[in-house]
Amino acid sequence: MAVKVIIPTPLRAYAGRQASVELQAATVAEALSALTAKFGDLKKHLYSDDGRLRSFVNVYVNDEDIRYLQKDQTRLNEGDTVSIVPSIAGGARY
């Protein structure tokens, strides 16, 4: 089924500068796999060397955090939106 994947601004440089893409996927894992197949440079920013989603990368399906659903096996429905949200750390030291 067709789903929309939102690509965050910091990662758009690795995705042809696209803000979003439409992909065919039945689960979050399939959507992310299709995304990294389409944009190979994204893979190292989303996954660690052991193939796991990086801990600072949060994924949402229709604003629901997949960590509280079925993680990457969360089922997708036609028209769902998958959002990738990398955590940002840093700041000034006082």
Q: Which residues are covered by each model-predicted region?
A:
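Ubiquitin-like/PB1-type beta-grasp interaction modules and other compact soluble beta-rich domains
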Residues: M1-Y94
